[in-house]
A protein has these predicted regions:
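Short, positively charged and aromatic/hydrophobic N-terminal segments
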Residues: 9-10
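Nuclease catalytic cores that cleave nucleic-acid phosphodiester bonds
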Residues: 15-157
């Protein structure tokens, strides 16, 4: 009798996980995901209602970082995390996932520490001075995000 060893191979498919509460590029994410046949998981707190007919939607209790931790808990190496939150981006990178912000900036081990440092310094400055908020979002910001996300997917798929 001959013995055969069957090799079991797990194939992992990239997914897009979105810290979606204040995400201004949900439409762009869905456009690319549908084109690339990727799953999308949108994470919201319970102050939001959302349905797009494509994404898996998670509605979580409104609380300290509940959305952030739920997103990171299901993330895996190779996923793309869309977030404005440097802490979430840091945790994503530690899991060997990719992280990108709403303007198309791809977070990496080289830039995340300087971003965290700058955030801390800016928080100190804001406490002592009246500073304006971020500039108004433009259509070009959405185009930049779309192009960066598409490039990130194509380079790592």
């Amino acid at each position: 009798s001959f013995g055969f060893i069957k090799e079991c191979v797990t194939i992992y498919v990239m997914r897009i996980l979105v810290d979606a509460d204040a995400c201004p590029v949900k439409k762009e994410i869905l456009d690319i995901a549908k084109k690339q046949l990727l799953e999308v998981h949108m994470f919201f707190d319970n102050a939001h209602e959302y349905e797009d007919g494509y994404s898996t939607v998670y509605i979580l209790d409104k609380g300290a970082d509940s959305v952030d931790y739920a997103l990171i808990n299901i993330s895996q190496s190779g996923d793309i995390i869309v977030t404005q939150d440097y802490g979430v981006a840091t945790m994503a990178l530690s899991k060997k996932a990719f992280a990108i912000n709403q303007n198309g900036l791809v977070y990496d081990d080289d830039n995340i520490m300087s971003l965290l440092t700058n955030r801390a310094m800016n928080q100190k400055i804001r406490r002592h001075k009246n500073m304006k908020g971020p500039k108004k979002r433009t259509q070009q910001d959405n185009v930049s995000f779309y192009n960066s996300l598409e490039k990130l997917i194509n380079m790592n798929k």
